[in-house]
């Protein structure tokens, strides 16, 4: 990340490392099998009721049922594309880690989501294939949410300056650790985070209420969008008024945080202890939390969840789509009663609170700022005219430094993509 400010005297480069993001939610609307009307999930590849083939069609934003048409093509049964031919992504048909579809005449072997993955784990280790599946699943959920918010994603070959790519790496045998983080448009995830037992050990050791794979993706995407939406833009000075000076020395802040910890009063000003470390991390934590709120409200609305508050003046959950919500205040009014209900349901199940957070007024102001930035970016993107089709995203997939097969079944030279310091 670069600090584009003449006050700094020089650009300050850093690779963000984030050991403790921790949020997960289902941002999906309800999907159904077009053959039998059974409800299906975003990740399903077959209907559990009638065994029909399923796949997600990005241009429809729908799960479609399919008949196998032969020659590697499938015929859609979805009313909006009935009879149209598609192909499963290579990572769907061969690697079993995806369920997205491409038009039959698309020459690309990979879907628009898988094309963003630059490096995959070494598949000679069978556990890594399962971790890869989980990583791709979380990544697709992130991409779904960003698309719903109107935020564009380009691969580096389509946008060398602002493109986004992912690397999924494992620790080396010589003790060198892969640090989850973001640097220069590349998000690196340590595949160990896809191991539930490892992630829970880390969560406990770091005293975190949540630690999820999807949360890592959300947080690191915040760093990526900071570079795209804040650095060097009209938002930089307003950002500093809300979050602080982004030109503060990151390495010193990191060292101070791990030496001294967070201030005792951090819940009054920050969404998490880690957010106190540096304005970059405060932004990324707040960004991730905003995505969580939008995802959960989107899901609740899509499933027809309605709350009947006990008092006439208490906020209610309105039947509106969160990503189209113009009023941030209304968004928050819908959010708080839902969290009360969610936590009450969890307690009735004998489980910990599903939403163990308290949003102080200062935190709500930061969320409001994220909302303003995203809304403005979405409006700007919607107003642009482009000749480039949205499914033209492309990238080259390699393997990690320990070898293995890439998404095309080949074994090209690997690249090392550690993002950290």
Residue spans of the language-model regions?
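Residues immediately within or flanking Cys/His clusters that coordinate Zn2+
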Residues: 30, 44, 83-86, 92-95, ...
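Short cysteine-rich clusters marking metal-coordination/redox-active sites
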Residues: 33-36, 47-50, 89, 111-114
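Cys/His-rich microdomains that often coordinate metals
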Residues: 37-40, 54, 93-96, 102, ...
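Pan-zinc metallopeptidase signature
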Residues: 38, 275-393, 399, 410-421
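Auxiliary, metal-adjacent structural segments of Zn-dependent hydrolase domains
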Residues: 126, 130-196
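Short pre-active-site segment immediately N-terminal to the catalytic Zn-binding motif
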Residues: 197-217
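Active-site recognition of the HExxH zinc-binding catalytic motif
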Residues: 211-231
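Post-HExxH zinc-binding segment in Zn-dependent metallohydrolases
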Residues: 226-281, 287-295
């Amino acid at each position: 990340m670069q600090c584009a400010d003449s006050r700094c005297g020089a650009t300050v480069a850093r690779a963000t490392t984030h050991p403790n993001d921790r949020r997960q939610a289902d941002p999906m609307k309800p999907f159904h099998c077009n053959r039998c009307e059974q409800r299906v999930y975003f990740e399903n590849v077959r209907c559990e009721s009638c065994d029909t083939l399923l796949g997600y069609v990005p241009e429809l934003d729908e799960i479609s049922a399919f008949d196998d048409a032969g020659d590697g093509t499938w015929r859609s049964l979805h009313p909006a594309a009935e009879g149209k031919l598609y192909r499963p992504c290579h990572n769907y048909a061969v690697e079993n880690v995806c369920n997205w579809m491409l038009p039959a005449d698309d020459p690309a072997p990979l879907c628009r989501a898988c094309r963003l993955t630059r490096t995959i784990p070494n598949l000679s280790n069978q556990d890594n294939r399962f971790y890869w599946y989980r990583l791709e699943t979380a990544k697709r959920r992130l991409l779904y949410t960003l698309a719903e918010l109107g935020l564009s994603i380009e691969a580096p070959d389509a946008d060398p300056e602002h493109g986004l790519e992912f690397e999924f790496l494992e620790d080396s045998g010589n003790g060198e650790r892969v640090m989850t983080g973001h640097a220069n448009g590349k998000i690196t995830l340590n595949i160990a985070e896809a191991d539930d037992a490892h992630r829970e050990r880390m969560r406990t050791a770091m005293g975190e209420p949540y630690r999820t794979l999807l949360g890592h993706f959300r947080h690191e995407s915040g760093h990526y969008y900071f570079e795209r939406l804040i650095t060097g833009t009209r938002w930089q000075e307003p950002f500093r008024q809300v979050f602080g000076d982004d030109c503060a020395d990151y390495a010193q802040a990191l060292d101070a945080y791990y030496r001294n910890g967070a201030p005792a009063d951090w819940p009054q000003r920050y969404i998490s202890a880690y957010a106190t470390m540096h304005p970059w991390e405060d932004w990324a934590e707040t960004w991730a939390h905003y995505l969580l709120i939008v995802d959960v409200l989107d899901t609740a609305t899509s499933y027809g969840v309605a709350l009947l508050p006990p008092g006439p003046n208490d906020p209610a959950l309105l039947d509106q789509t969160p990503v189209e919500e113009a009023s941030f205040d209304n968004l928050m009014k819908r959010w708080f009663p839902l969290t009360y209900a969610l936590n009450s349901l969890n307690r009735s199940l004998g489980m910990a609170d599903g939403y163990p957070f308290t949003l102080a007024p200062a935190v709500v102001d930061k969320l409001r700022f994220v909302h303003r930035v995203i809304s403005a970016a979405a409006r700007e993107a919607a107003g642009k005219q482009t000749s480039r089709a949205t499914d033209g995203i492309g990238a080259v997939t390699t393997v990690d430094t320990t070898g293995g097969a890439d998404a095309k079944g080949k074994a090209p030279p690997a690249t090392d993509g550690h993002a950290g310091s």
